[in-house]
């Protein structure tokens, strides 16, 4: 699967999971969930153009975006884990791993 296809697939998964997190968690957990939304927004900014980026520029153009999104997910995961929402924190960890693997493949 191409980098651009994986990027879009991760974004789609992140957006779907974010919606589910809002359904599962109490209203008090919305601040960490906002970080999940921000991570999706970071990725969404390049979603349309990702397939048009020349192979040689993929790392320099996508790495900063992926790193920022990963950082936001990490902060959300830690906050949710601290609040006792381990299951959702574990699911966010899985999303982080998808981004990490994509970053390594750039």
Residue ranges: model-predicted function:
Residues 1-106:
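Long, charged/polar, soluble alpha-helical segments
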């Amino acid at each position: 699967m191409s980098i651009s296809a994986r990027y879009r697939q991760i974004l789609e998964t992140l957006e779907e999971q974010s919606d589910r997190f809002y359904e599962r968690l109490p209203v008090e957990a919305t601040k960490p969930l906002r970080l999940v939304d921000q991570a999706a927004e970071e990725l969404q900014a390049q979603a349309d153009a990702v397939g048009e980026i020349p192979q040689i520029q993929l790392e320099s153009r996508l790495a900063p975006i992926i790193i920022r999104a990963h950082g936001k997910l990490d902060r959300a995961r830690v906050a949710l884990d601290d609040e006792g929402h381990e299951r959702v924190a574990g699911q966010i960890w899985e999303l982080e791993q998808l981004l990490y693997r994509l970053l390594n493949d750039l």
